[in-house]
Amino acid sequence: MTTVLILMATHNGGSFLAEQLDSIAAQSHADWRLMVSDDASSDNTPAVLQAFRAARPTGQVALVSGPGRGAAANFRSLIRQARLSGECLAFCDQDDVWHPEHLARGLEALAGIANPLALYGSRVQVCDAGLNPVGLSPLPSRPLCFRNALVQNVISGNTQIMSPAAAALLQAA
């Protein structure tokens, strides 16, 4: 079974965080590790994270401190700190709720790609604060290809799962 390292950056996300953590724990693909970087939250985010880590097997959840420079710097810091050893890499946001098959579907799609540098992404079911569906994320307006990815967001970051080779390349960048 392929291990997936999930990276999550948090900051004052306590009001939504438990639902995302529960959705990670409920994944049908159970071979995952979670690394969370909290960027100086002043709400209950640290307590929610500590409780989740305490309820999981030892070593499955790692908590680190963010750099204190915003969401993008927090994710970059996570990528640099990740201890990769051949895992696929997935990203999530603190206010996501993953479908139980999210990791399994992504890994199945990656397994069907011959190129070792592979990236999976999906559309997002957009919900309101009560988790009531309000629509799907828009489809890209241009064909999916590298050239268009340079000028258009073709894969939402919070749906990305990348192959081990792609994860290593990202970390080395």
Where are these regions (language model features)?
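Nucleotide-sugar donor-binding/catalytic module of glycosyltransferases
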Residues: 1-173
